[in-house]
Amino acid sequence: MLEYLLLLISTVLVNNFVLVKFLGLCPFMGVSKKIEPAVGMGLATTFVLTLTSAFAYLVQHYLLVPLAAESLSTLAFILVIAVVVQFTEMVIHKSAPDLYRILGIYLPLITTNCIVLGLALLNITMQHNFMQSVVYGFGGGLGFMLVLILFASLRERLAAADVPAPFQGIAIGMVTAGLMSLAFLGFTGLIKL
């Protein structure tokens, strides 16, 4: 049990996919202007990452490995991701139409978000078992949601600040993301797995 907790904390803080591995930067910059869509996108991505991790593990170990078709893992994972994202989109559309409208094009774009495919491939590379894969996916989603909400709150404050003209817009966003990345590097060495 402690192993799973350490893996979760490590994935959220120490090895954050956005700020340390630089995966998922498109939605990180695109959906982080306001906190509400950031929370919705974070929850949707966490849901997708957790389910994708579970299904990618099952496809890899119970379909591809027995058929000696490991070379098709990337293609198989893309199909798994597409199905999970479509399912997530239907659930959000039925249960939270306002969130569905706010997320707009970013919801189906989770399919092409490199964090989702990267996580599935990293699970296989790191040889995680089923529970480790699910925890790694959940932790990756929580880490993504954490930095997305933090970044959105900072961008809301920056929108009200007196930022010099050359730094307005995306420039101050990149500087802020860089400073956040440096702050998260402070967690390095916190957990040794």
UniProtKB/Swiss-Prot annotation:
Keywords: Cell inner membrane, Cell membrane, Electron transport, Membrane, Translocase, Transmembrane, Transmembrane helix, Transport. It is found in: Cell inner membrane. GO terms for biological process: electron transport chain. Its EC number is 7.-.-.-. The keyword Cell division does not apply. It is a multi-pass membrane protein. GO terms for cellular component: plasma membrane. It holds the Pfam family Rnf-Nqr. InterPro entries: Ion_transpt_RnfA/RsxA, NqrDE/RnfAE, NqrDE/RnfAE_oxidrdctase. Its main location: membrane. The chain crosses the membrane at residues 5-25, 39-59, 72-92, 102-122, 134-154, 170-190. The complex is composed of six subunits: RnfA, RnfB, RnfC, RnfD, RnfE and RnfG. NCBIfam families: PRK05151.1 (NF003481), rnfA (TIGR01943). Part of a membrane-bound complex that couples electron transfer with translocation of ions across the membrane. Belongs to the NqrDE/RnfAE family. This is Ion-translocating oxidoreductase complex subunit A. It comes from Tolumonas auensis (strain DSM 9187 / NBRC 110442 / TA 4). The gene is rnfA.
